Amino acid sequence: MRWVGEVFDVLGVTGQDHEASFPDGAAFRLEIPSVEGPRVLEAVLRAAEAEGITVNRVSQGSGAMLLRASELRDMAQAGLDAGVEVCLFVGPRERFATGAHARSADGRAHGDQVRGLRQLAYALEDVLRATEEGIRSFLVADLGLLRAVRLAQARGALPTDLVWKVSASMSPTNPVTVKILEELGAGTVNIPADVTLDELAEMRAAVSLPLDLYVESPDPLGGIVRVQELADLVRTGAPLYAKFGLRNAQAIYPSGHHLEAVACANATEKVHRAAVALEWLERLSPGLVQSKPGAAGLGLPVR
């Protein structure tokens, strides 16, 4: 098998374990997903204050395209005031469109990809529209879109200070793939919720970018609950975004006012789960440091 090791060396995925951190020296940050609009963001911030914890990033899944400009501004302002990154999914995707492929048994894996040049153009416009209202962080789930937005930045069509977060729906399952995503310009990458510590260590050794990991994942992503493992996950994967989904929760994509109460209730419980996980971390590894609000490297909104 020596020849396999030589191939891995050329690919650059056999690096030694190393201690790494965020730009502020912290080992981990907390992320609350499915924060679908201003009211849900308010619920997260209230819950974080009540629980006495810091949320560093919120992310959204329905797409920036389903929010009014005023709602984008409200989310940007709330995130800026709280020192929280607001990461919005790029809206257009195959499972929202007219084709049947993404709704078939074999095509579901392609559901968050962007189909055709017209939808890719809409996706780019969705990013530009959100940046005009102050958003500086986006979820992408399509390789072509990631390449296109990076080119748009290089040409001056999009701001240079944007964070590109690879979605869990495009999670890489080996170090070579996560390294390719880093080379394409991803800023952070969501990896599968069920990775073992050994697999997490392999990915960490291959790349320097932050890894995003569901400590608790929603049922469509496996329904994993690992709150007691947070310390091990951080020690192995730092710099790590510890992401708190919610098992046994109603699916809400695409969300809206009709599901706002559910989204707020889910978000509040996610913050509670994060607080529980932090107690486990403090019990087992009290020296692990979390980023403060507004820390360097966050894709904070702008006015």
Language-model-detected regions and their locations in the chain:
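Active-site pocket-lining/capping segments in soluble small-molecule metabolic enzymes
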Residues: 1-135, 140-172, 197-303
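Conserved catalytic-core segments centered on acid/base and nucleophilic motifs
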Residues: 138, 186-192
